[in-house]
Amino acid sequence: MKKFLSLLLVLVLALSFAACTSQAPADVDEPVAADGSDLEYVVGNGKMVIGYTVYEPMNYTDDNGEFVGFDTEYAKAVCAKLGVEPEFVEINWDTKEVELKAKNIDCVWNGFTITEERKQNIEFTTPYISNKQVVVIKAENKDKYTDTASLSAANLVAEIESAGEGAIKDDENLSKANYVSVAKQTDGLLEVKSGTADAVVLDYTLASAMVGEGTDYADLIIIDGLDLAVEEYGIGFRKGSDLAAKVNEITAELNADGTMDEIAAKYDMSAILVK
């Protein structure tokens, strides 16, 4: 019996030692935990993962293959002051909040319209751009479509979950139209250009940069005088994130030293820059 107990004790000790020694050492390259502070999380990781969709003039690739845009340069300037690298990740706009909550991205920095509904789940910075929704049609239809009443029987498109979609649903006339959502605002322009849609409701910032003479959409125009929802852009972080306040602080510095003015002038956005 004693011999059996001795053998059992040796076996237990051996198993305990094996279990302890088999544990892998901590990986020093693993991301820093962020149970409390997103600011500490981002600084600790040495990067800010920024969610975006292709949206000229905010985030896009130019003819030289360089990733540029107002929001792109703004984000780089903020990250430089934070001492971290910006990492831009293209996302599906419809799942942006899911990506944020899952920490696949640290923020949405992409012409993100501030709304009361979104504020319930998103921590926004103070506004930095004043924008509006406009309607783009083929130039040949400029006399046919002049106001929301004339568009009430048209085939409309807008980016899903966008301010453009909201403007359609909230307008008495536009809500009667034949509406189909698209994945991206640029998809809406393609639909109108190809003739599968009569009009697209989208951000003025994008429309003014991509439509008209000298662009790929030279045959499209913005309906003159038809301004829909007026809105403001903010950078979206996880609800309760301390990064929003820090970015506000840095933005104030960038306004003071003229950086924001320089970026806005470069992308012809000086008139809608909010300080």
Question: Where do the protein language model's features map onto the residues?
Answer:
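A ligand-binding cleft/hinge motif common to bilobed small-molecule-binding domains
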Residues: 95, 112-120, 167-170, 193-194, ...
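A bilobed periplasmic-binding-protein/Venus flytrap-type ligand-binding module shared by bacterial periplasmic
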Residues: 134-143, 230-246, 250
